[in-house]
Curated annotation (Swiss-Prot):
Heme binds at residue 435. GO terms for molecular function: heme binding; iron ion binding; oxidoreductase activity, acting on paired donors, with incorporation or reduction of molecular oxygen, reduced flavin or flavoprotein as one donor, and incorporation of one atom of oxygen. This is Cytochrome P450 2C25. The gene is CYP2C25. It is found in: Endoplasmic reticulum membrane; Microsome membrane. The keyword Oxidoreductase applies. The keyword ATP-binding does not apply. It comes from Mesocricetus auratus. Gene3D superfamilies: Cytochrome P450. Belongs to the cytochrome P450 family. Its cofactor is heme.
Amino acid sequence: MDAVLVLVFILSSLVFLSLWRQSSERRKLPPGPTPLPIIGNFLQIDVKNISGSLTNFSKVYGPVFTLYLGMKPTVVLHGYETVKEALIDHGEEFAGRGDFPMAERINKGLGIVFSNGNRWKEIRRFSLMTLRNLGMGKRNIEDRVQEEAQCLVEELRKTNGSPCDPTFILSCAPCNVICSIIFQNRFDYKDQDFLTFMKKVNENVRILSSPWLQVCNNFPSLIDYCPGSHHKITKNVNYLKKYILEKIEEHQESLDIENPRDFIDYYLIKLKQANHNQQSEFSLENLTTTVSDLFGAGTETTSTTLRYALLLLLKHPHVTAKVQEEIDQVVGRHRKPCMQDRSHMPYTDAMIHEVQRFIDLIPISLPHAVTCDIKFRDYFIPKGTTVITSLSSVLHDNKEFPNPEVFDPGHFLDKNGNFKKSDYFMPFSAGKRICAGEGLARMELFLFLTTILQNFKLKSMIHPKDIDTTPVVNGFASLPPSYQLCFIPV
């Protein structure tokens, strides 16, 4: 009986504390729905369609509102003007990385994606500089992507025009590009170490996209005490870091300071230079996490976009025909597509932009945090508050993109058929935390897609009108449904 009374007292105290904290915080923060004790507004959010839930809230509370995901407040930014004002006009103040408990348990604040403060600035600056250096070498990044595009074509030829699921092959190509940048070497598509490594990376992205992970991130105590797929992420990350560490040790043995070969070499040189600096952010542990981040951010996202692009091209054969006509006119059949071609291929460029806009791959981006107390649109947001941005509300703005739910490359073409830029194009987010690999990803999408369409006719297994392009998961990432197609050589 005493134990029951103690439990009731503890639960009552928690409820009271939750109510007291929420009432005092809510007086200062932007408006929002009334939260329940402990669980906040979680039951009011569709974890399978978070962006849709945010749109519904914005209709009631405006473009800046507060949700309680658990006991902590989260400020939501909805619509282009609001997102731009925060991430670009007040970029420094909104440059923090917000709460993502699952990643914090794994990365311990290291790496480039989930780090904060000076550590994040140092690692990001170094990573961007190194990618530029690798792009300006004797064998630059475009050469690597072109080489991989040809390997991709050869693998697709092996299907002999038979029906196939393109998921595996389209995952190999961008993963191999990252391998060549990080490890210097690409891998054969049948290499078992490569296949296992790629499988772990892709599996983690899929788990991170699941509704269960959204629950874990909002109630972090579940991470330690409940069974579930989140434990698989930890095992996969441990495997990836062990593999990466083995590669680092190989590089240490063969390092030539005067002739860095890849990202790891550049980092090891930086590590030697900072060896006597106790305040340095450069360590072997940070290197393994940074490399893991680069693979996680730069492989599955690009391969998913490629997979979605082919599905949309099957759904809209008239678009495919126009792209292939442009490829024939500009590139022809006897040379490889290159990045210089893009400025002469406005329809193809518009098609790729429209794929990224339409699929809305990362609907709410990763969480931001304010780095200091800030008054934003007459609301006070305390330092450290988590902020999420609805990229869906920008990419699917019906004034900038008429009929935004329709796939139409015309959204990025002017009346004369020239490519038309849009400030609303934010699939890589915006501001200080914009994706560090944006340039590489855009290069891969252009070169991989044009090379595929230069060499193959895409044949659907069903009538185009029956093709479903609805994402199967719409939590952290929007993933396309499984499908098969035939790559018919031309």
